[in-house]
């Protein structure tokens, strides 16, 4: 299983390499990459099954973010796992935001990686056909409300602007927290901004 790791943190690289080796991936199939340009070349030449990327490698540069977005779109049969660079927050979940793009906490447990990568570790096949989890999506109301929430508007302001009861606003907030698997506002905002950065944003159900 060809794998690429793009993370400037040596501890993370060591941890991921150790995990992959313990699951039967050969050392020669694990490649460390440092730049987005090198990642594009490696993805074209190696057609990796999985690419691990730390968002710190691209998030601070708009052109790098666009390039990452392009690479993800160009390789639909590669699973890209992007680690959130968010400190001092207890969050060890992961979210599928596109068929081949998963946003994850760096605190993800080995068992969770097993759940995600289990089938691809056993079979030489495209990972995206095995991912048995729903893609994160919001209703139109949830999406509009989340933008207002992120803009610093409170429940009463959102209630007035959307012409819905405050209780309904709270209910929508509860749904958003459930879907993003956290009650931490900082994590929610981070997930939204990162998704906006490397895709066209969280899917919105137009129904």
UniProtKB/Swiss-Prot annotation:
CDD domains named among the record's database cross-references: LuxR_C_like (cd06170)
Molecular function GO terms recorded: DNA binding
Pfam hit, one: GerE
DNA-binding region(s), chain positions: 155-174
Family classification: Belongs to the RcsA family.
HAMAP family: RcsA
Function, in words: Component of the Rcs signaling system, which controls transcription of numerous genes. Binds, with RcsB, to the RcsAB box to regulate expression of genes. Involved in regulation of K30 capsular polysaccharide synthesis.
UniProt name for this protein: Transcriptional regulatory protein RcsA
The organism of origin for this protein: Escherichia coli
Lineage of the organism: Bacteria, Pseudomonadati, Pseudomonadota, Gammaproteobacteria, Enterobacterales
